[in-house]
Amino acid sequence: MNNIKSISLVFPLYKDKNTVEVMIFKSLQILKKIKKKFEIIIVDDGCPEGSGKIAQRYAKKNQKIKVFFHAKNIGYGAAIKTGIKKSKYECIFLIDGDNEYNVNDLPRMLKALKNNDLVITYRYKNKNNI
């Protein structure tokens, strides 16, 4: 998958009020450095505490951020599916809105895509807690 020109970054949200702003900020920083066309797709999966409304404030200030809402909580998989359907760019990255995974790893994932069609990453804790 050489020569990626555009990226859609998808965040499913559910009860992520305390992390959504950090995720948006970090994502914008990293995606601007990558220097490719990008969008950030945020899917509020019926959050009862207003995570999506926080994201929507950022979307009003930045047209690269788009927020979609489920009327009620229908699950993580449904939020991902909505995010993928709403994505318009060729390369889609899925990262949870709770800041569990480091968005700073995006450049490494892009590099891995040069020789592969799919890259899956996960956290691993070894005996040294790394």
Could you say what each language-model-derived stretch is?
Residues 36-47, 68-70:
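Short beta-strand/loop segment that forms part of the nucleotide-sugar
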Residues 31-36, 58-64:
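Short helix-capping segments at alpha-helix termini
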Residues 68-86, 91, 100-130:
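Acceptor/aglycone-binding surface of glycosyltransferases and processive sugar-polymer synthases
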Residues 44-52, 99:
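A conserved acidic beta->alpha catalytic loop
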Residues 18-22, 49-57:
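Acidic helix N-cap motif at the loop->helix transition within catalytic regions
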Residues 1-29, 36:
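N-proximal low-complexity "stem/linker" segments adjacent to membrane-targeting elements
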